[in-house]
Amino acid sequence: MAVPKRRMSRANTRSRRAQWKAEAPGLVTVSVAGQQRKVPRRLLKAARLGLVDLDKR
């Protein structure tokens, strides 16, 4: 594992950490029981099979 040679300043640490950002999941339109819904792509199969409750919103 890499060991830093010198201490990193607070400003450099925070600016480096600020590069990490959360992204919203890409939504895909799926029709369930005649209604169009937008779900994340990884839940597409579960939504079609009825394993996900889409009426919570």
Swiss-Prot record:
InterPro entries: Ribosomal_bL32, Ribosomal_zn-bd. One of its GO terms (cellular component) is large ribosomal subunit. Residues 1-19 have a biased composition (Basic residues). Pfam families: Ribosomal_L32p. Coiled coil: none annotated. Keywords: Ribonucleoprotein, Ribosomal protein. The keyword Ribosomal protein applies. GO terms for molecular function: structural constituent of ribosome. Residues 1-20 are annotated as: Disordered. GO terms for biological process: translation. Belongs to the bacterial ribosomal protein bL32 family. HAMAP family: Ribosomal_bL32. This is Large ribosomal subunit protein bL32. It comes from Mycolicibacterium smegmatis (strain ATCC 700084 / mc(2)155) (Mycobacterium smegmatis).
